[in-house]
Regions:
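Glycine-rich phosphate/ribose-binding loops and adjacent secondary-structure elements
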Residues: 1-112
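C-terminal extensions of enzymes
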Residues: 88, 116-172
Length: 172
């Protein structure tokens, strides 16, 4: 994709999931998002494509996870499950049947009427604003003035195997 001029690449690790995915696929196909992110950023940088934006997704739910992803080289973090939870998903795991009782993953008009788009939009807005504020705090704590300045050297691992896998320092 980058060889034909793509502006960005989205890498999706297996840490996320959709309620519509079969369990055997969701749990056993792919590699962890952190590893996929590290490998993708290294490849882009090593092949003169550092200008290509890297978007990562797959299991990122909390601001600390998102900030770490940015420090590992993501230019953006796409959220699915976290956004669904923010708008009211209660994880009934009925997405694949189209019978979501809270009205999110359905085309059934009766079920859809249970979701108030204005309330859901406000909840999502509050979640994203709070997450951004917390990520900005993480950047400041490391001496950075913005999220975009977070870098791999701002991270440390407690486990040597994780440090080696992600090319970060070990602090025990």
């Amino acid at each position: 994709a980058v060889d034909v001029g793509a502006d960005y690449v989205v890498v999706d690790g297996f840490g996320g999931g959709t309620g519509a995915a079969p369990v055997h696929v969701r749990d056993h196909v792919g590699i962890p998002s952190w590893v996929a992110l590290h490998r993708a950023r290294a490849w882009l940088d090593d092949h003169d494509h550092a200008d290509v934006q890297l978007v990562v997704t797959g299991g990122y739910r909390t601001p600390d996870e998102m900030a770490k992803a940015m420090a590992l080289g993501a230019d953006a973090v796409a959220l699915a499950t976290a956004s669904m939870m923010a708008i009211g998903c209660q994880q009934y795991r009925a997405c694949h049947r189209g019978t979501c009782p809270v009205g999110i993953a359905t085309q059934n008009p009766v079920l859809r009427s249970r979701l108030d788009p204005a309330v859901s939009a406000e909840r999502l807005t509050r979640f994203l604003l709070a997450a951004t504020e917390m990520m900005t705090d993480y950047a400041r704590i490391t001496g950075r003035s913005s999220l975009g300045e977070l870098a791999r050297k701002d991270l440390a691992a407690l486990r040597p195997d994780v440090a080696a896998l992600l090319d970060i320092d070990v602090r025990a």
